[in-house]
């Protein structure tokens, strides 16, 4: 474990293996005034992200940086355990490829689950493409999103769907991050009126126009990527984030519905594990980390070859009641494509049915991620590992799809 100290807060990092860029990002966060008083804990899968660190957990009060939650609001895994003890991977692949759009594709007609959410309730509804969003429920996306069939040592079969809020989450996150920076670099109406009244009181009426011109913008107290919302914007962001989180859940459930119906599966257990959100009941932000409350069932995926950890939370307050959301990358996507070959990728996936191994998914190969031992050895204080489920089928859309 490492302890990092910034100007306004400190952080515990629950691993000894951390790259310099991640450390720099964490310290930059700890140097922001709105982090003062927060309990910041970094998960063992910590790695640098776009402006902020993946694997972040922190308590919040009345201010939040939208970028800390990120653009894929509500992203997570939907997991089901089947009554069936045998599946046909070729048929499953056909059902997925014919019934679940992936990559940048959306549905030609909305899934029936689209009726379960009203996007007009978004505070920023005029800033998002709601028609595209409704047609995106039941779509996988690309990158590290996946659909897997896994088996445990007792022969139980699980289906796991990993996806999030698609383009809707991106639009909401970008809107509020821009609004945050604009609010921090703009003088309020009250500040402008106070300046005018002061100039009048001082007999400096002739200077009013020049002063107003100089008050068009002010220096932000924080870097743009870490700009925060507060007050009414804070409440609006939380409201819209919860809708995006609901949207992401419906998206995963719609895909699972397509799979279960298409395959004729019988579900005997189902649970959700979310990793980009704010737990508003406990006011804990989790970016690339998951809830691990006492007795809570959760899933930690490792990579395409090694599968996932089925765990039960221990409710450890020192960990912010959290656990890592995965193994964490060893290298960037571009570096992975330079370091490995498709031939190596295919060898690593031997014994797992997949039609998704190729140049476009090379950045997602098992070798690009930390190993299972790197995570299992660090999470004992926060979860109990109940089982390791191994992939028998995997589907991913590449970055060129």
Where are these regions (language model features)?
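Domain-length cofactor-binding catalytic modules of enzymes
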Residues: 2-28, 35-42, 48-54, 58, ...
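Acidic, glycine-rich active-site loops and adjacent beta-strand->loop/helix elements
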Residues: 46-47, 75
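A generic, well-ordered mixed alpha/beta core segment in the N-terminal half of proteins
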Residues: 66-121
């Amino acid at each position: 474990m490492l302890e990092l100290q910034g100007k306004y807060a400190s952080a515990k990092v629950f691993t000894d293996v951390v790259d310099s860029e991640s450390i720099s990002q964490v310290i930059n966060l700890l140097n922001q005034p709105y982090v003062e008083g927060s309990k910041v804990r970094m998960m063992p899968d910590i790695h640098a992200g776009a402006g902020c660190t993946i694997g972040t957990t922190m308590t919040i009060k009345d201010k939040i940086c939208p970028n800390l939650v990120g653009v894929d609001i509500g992203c997570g895994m939907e997991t089901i355990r089947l009554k069936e003890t045998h599946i046909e991977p070729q048929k499953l692949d056909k059902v997925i490829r014919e019934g679940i759009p992936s990559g940048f594709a959306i549905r030609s007609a909305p899934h029936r689950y689209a009726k379960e959410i009203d996007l007009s309730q978004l505070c920023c509804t005029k800033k998002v493409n709601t028609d595209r969003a409704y047609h995106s429920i039941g779509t996988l996306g690309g990158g590290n999103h996946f659909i897997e069939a896994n088996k445990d040592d007792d022969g139980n079969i699980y289906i796991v769907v990993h996806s999030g809020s698609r383009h809707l989450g991106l639009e909401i996150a970008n809107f509020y991050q821009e609004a945050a920076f604009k609010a921090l670099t703009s003088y309020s109406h009250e500040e402008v009126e106070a300046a005018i009244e002061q100039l009048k009181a001082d007999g400096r009426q002739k200077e009013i126009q020049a002063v107003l011109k100089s008050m068009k913008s002010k220096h932000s107290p924080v870097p743009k990527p870490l700009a925060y919302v507060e007050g009414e914007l804070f409440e609006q962001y939380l409201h819209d984030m919860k809708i995006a989180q609901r949207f992401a859940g419906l998206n995963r459930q719609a895909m699972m519905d397509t799979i279960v119906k298409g395959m004729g599966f019988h579900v005997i257990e189902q649970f959700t594990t979310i990793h980009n959100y704010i737990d508003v009941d406990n006011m804990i932000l989790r970016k690339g980390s998951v809830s691990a409350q006492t007795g809570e069932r959760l899933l930690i995926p490792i990579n395409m070859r090694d599968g996932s950890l089925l765990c039960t939370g221990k409710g450890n307050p020192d960990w912010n009641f959290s656990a890592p959301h995965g193994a964490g990358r060893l290298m960037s996507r571009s570096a992975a494509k330079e370091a490995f070959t498709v031939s190596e990728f295919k060898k690593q996936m031997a014994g797992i049915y997949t039609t998704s191994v190729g140049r476009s998914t090379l950045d997602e190969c098992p070798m690009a991620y930390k190993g299972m031992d790197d995570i299992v050895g660090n999470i004992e204080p926060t979860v109990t590992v109940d089982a390791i489920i191994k992939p028998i089928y995997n589907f991913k859309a590449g970055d060129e799809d």
